[in-house]
Amino acid sequence: MRSGLSWRNWAAAGLFVLVAGPGQSQPTGGERAMLTRLEAGQWELRGGSANARIAAICLGNPILLTQPRHGAAPCTRDVVAADASSMTVNYSCPGLGRGRTTIRFETPRLVQIDSQGLDHGRPFVLRAEARRVGQCAGA
């Protein structure tokens, strides 16, 4: 597996803060076909050769799964391919970086994420399984 940074460094740095906040853009067009079927709540991302836990996230707006290294940053997105079972998005976050992410739908509680791009000028590659594991704390 290719990797620009280790999974442990990602988790330690807290780069997966994916809680939708006010002003976040909502899914439109081809994004809706798959993303509207995902359940909000507590999700866990696992990946790497040991299937290690990368992060736990409270997912409100599923579109944020398309920009995993840039969290809830205000980014522009271009859907380059989408159907009922997968989507590929190019995104750009001014001053932070950009990426290309493919999400493959398995169930409303399980998706596969494949993302790569630049984060503050440094390349990254992420391949992870995202699984809903319950309600968000305080929900």
Question: Where are the regions a protein language model picked out?
Answer:
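Short, surface-exposed coil-to-beta transition loops
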Residues: L96-T101, Q112, P123-R127
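Short beta-strand segments that buttress and anchor functional surface loops
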Residues: W43-G47, M87-P94, I103, I113-D119
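Amphipathic/hydrophobic helical signal segments and adjacent flexible N-terminal regions
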Residues: R2-A40, G48, R132, C136-A139
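Exposed beta-sheet edge/beta-hairpin loop segments within beta-rich domains
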Residues: L18, M34, I103, D119-G121
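A charged, solvent-exposed segment within the mature domains of Sec-exported extracytoplasmic proteins
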Residues: L118-A139
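A generic structural signal for short beta-strands and their flanking turns/coil linkers
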Residues: E39-G41, S85-M87, T107-V111, L126
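Central antiparallel beta-sheet cores of small beta-barrel/beta-sandwich binding domains
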Residues: N51-P108
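Low-complexity, acidic/polar, glycine-enriched regions of mature
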Residues: Q26-P27, G41-Q42, S49-A50, P62-H70, ...
